Amino acid sequence: LDGEDGRKRIDAFLLPGHVAVVLGLEPFRFLAREYGRPAVVGGFEPADILSALCLMVGMLREGKPAVGNTYIRAVHEEGSPQARHVMETVFSVADARWRGLGLIPDSGLALRGEWRDFDAMEKLGLELEETKPIPGCRCGDILRGVLTPEKCPLFGRVCTPQNPTGPCMVSTEGSCAA
């Protein structure tokens, strides 16, 4: 969360509402507890995002990191126990490769053994190809907070929401297109 030069790179976290709907708030509490950073669950509408940012700024100004929730119409403290139970029954934690970041241990999910018959990759004998870096794309640095989107040499030129080059621009919710 801090840069190699000791400066803070990430001040706070805008947490994903769709994940918190299932998991609740507890899995995010370590951000405030261990790293001293505010973290707020927000929805996807502009007013939802603004509301989450306002709460986040208040926490930063007061110097009181916590986990907040402004997406109360969908996210509850405990999440969805039923959905979590299904996830835990069908999936196990696995290493995952993330566009722009590479392999992150224990950051993904894989079908448990008894569900492997439903694994299309295994069933069809497919393997994911290693993704090649995109020349000039700085998505990894943007996702880590090292660069802002407009500092990427591709941003707004060859990489736009209509013609995304890297993973940061692949949707209107991406870190560059949002």
Across the structure, where does each feature detected by a protein language model lie?
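Cysteine-cluster motifs in flexible loop/terminal segments that predominantly coordinate metals
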Residues: 128-178
